[in-house]
């Protein structure tokens, strides 16, 4: 896991996108124009969660090092220390990939 000095707030999650495959199973190279936007990422940092109507904090089900599937067009792209990250809201996370 990368050591990043970015701490997400509330229900925000900092992820590093896992690069999509550049070749097919048969060895064909996939051109950039044909690649789909990746939707899988590794969680780098997790915010503490949002507050409910009564002021109780609702923790997130996601933790650092989880691999997640996220909404294709969700999040905000961030470049920090020469590395690209994506800052997502918890609602942008669709699933956790079990190892």
From Swiss-Prot:
Record key words, sorted: Chaperone, Cytoplasm
Transmembrane domains' residue ranges = none
Q: Which SUPFAM superfamilies match?
A: GroES-like
Q: Which GO terms describe its molecular function?
A: ATP binding; metal ion binding; protein folding chaperone; protein-folding chaperone binding; unfolded protein binding
Which GO BP terms apply? chaperone cofactor-dependent protein refolding
UniProt subcellular location: Cytoplasm
Report the PROSITE patterns cross-referenced here: CHAPERONINS_CPN10
A GO cellular-component term linked to this record = cytoplasm
Q: One matching Pfam family, short form?
A: Cpn10
Q: Which domain of life is it from?
A: Bacteria
Q: Does the keyword Chaperone apply?
A: yes
Relate the assembly described in the record: Heptamer of 7 subunits arranged in a ring. Interacts with the chaperonin GroEL.
Q: Which family does it belong to?
A: Belongs to the GroES chaperonin family.
Main function: Together with the chaperonin GroEL, plays an essential role in assisting protein folding. The GroEL-GroES system forms a nano-cage that allows encapsulation of the non-native substrate proteins and provides a physical environment optimized to promote and accelerate protein folding. GroES binds to the apical surface of the GroEL ring, thereby capping the opening of the GroEL channel.
Any idea what this protein is called? Co-chaperonin GroES
Q: Which organism is it from?
A: Corynebacterium glutamicum (strain ATCC 13032 / DSM 20300 / JCM 1318 / BCRC 11384 / CCUG 27702 / LMG 3730 / NBRC 12168 / NCIMB 10025 / NRRL B-2784 / 534)
């Amino acid at each position: 896991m990368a050591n990043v000095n970015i701490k997400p707030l509330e229900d925000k999650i900092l992820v590093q996108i896992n690069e999509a495959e550049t070749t097919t199973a048969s060895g064909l190279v996939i051109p950039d124009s044909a690649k789909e936007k990746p939707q899988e990422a590794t969680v780098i940092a997790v915010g503490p969660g949002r507050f409910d109507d009564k002021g109780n904090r609702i923790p997130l089900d996601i933790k650092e090092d989880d691999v997640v599937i996220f909404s294709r067009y969700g999040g905000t792209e961030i470049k920090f220390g020469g590395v690209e990250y994506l800052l997502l809201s918890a609602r942008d996370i669709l699933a956790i990939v079990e190892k």
